[in-house]
């Protein structure tokens, strides 16, 4: 849970690319003059049409540019949280100067990101694969600094999924039987994702599904029930993050939408039936672990975003 359920700002595919770009720029030690980005088909597809937090723009070029300009790899999936208007203007200039080249890389893991930065005679190269924050290879000027591929971390199309194999019974027993104080931390997911939903309702993000569902026509045709409450709260948080709002959410298995879907329907229903805190904690833990369990079979990157 601690490994898979972490905060993220923005859609995790372009943010993961920004993370690789930030790491490559840090290793280079200079502002890159050229940036080459090689991506798996799923990363390329999932990142093409979503909003980048705080920019009002969509797609990979601005994510890559900002990653090299203001990104800090230590921030993980919150790599772009130091964005300023000045940095955004610089990022737009990098795109206009055509310093970024993005291409498809075949026969690699579904989640594969490679960024090569250069300035003068110096170069750096960073590879993320299998997981959104999993840096497996770092190189500077032809010298390998890190190569976790030698440790059995595969980045080809046949790479194995997580070594830990969960079962339904294991997940259920853990959620139902663990001492409450040891799993109470899962309430952080409810707190963060609820704030994202509430912030979304103060603006007009994405398709404004939440406002439609809870508005006059939504209530007329869909009713006012526990189901519509769950739908409205969940859609609010998803709309905001997919539209590029600077709102952090708690992700699951590298997906903000999966983290939201594992959290907010449970929280909304718990509030509707006024259940105990213990029941909410155990339900949230079961929900998040079930997502991780299911992703073992589906793979970390699905055909659709989230």
Regions found by a protein language model. Give the residues of each.
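FAD-binding core of FAD-dependent oxidoreductases
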Residues: 11-18, 53-68, 253-263, 305-306
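Hydrophobic alpha-helical bundle architecture
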Residues: 25, 269-282, 292-306
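Early transmembrane hairpin of solute transport permeases
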Residues: 18-117
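Short, Gly/Pro- and small/polar-rich lid/capping loops
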Residues: 1-14, 19, 92-96
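Acidic-glycine-rich active-site phosphate/pyrophosphate-binding loop
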Residues: 29-43, 225-244, 276-295
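A short glycine/serine-rich beta->alpha loop
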Residues: 2-11, 45-55, 245-255, 296-305
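Signature of multi-pass transmembrane helix bundles
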Residues: 96-244
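Alpha-helical support elements that line or immediately flank enzyme active sites
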Residues: 14-30, 257-275
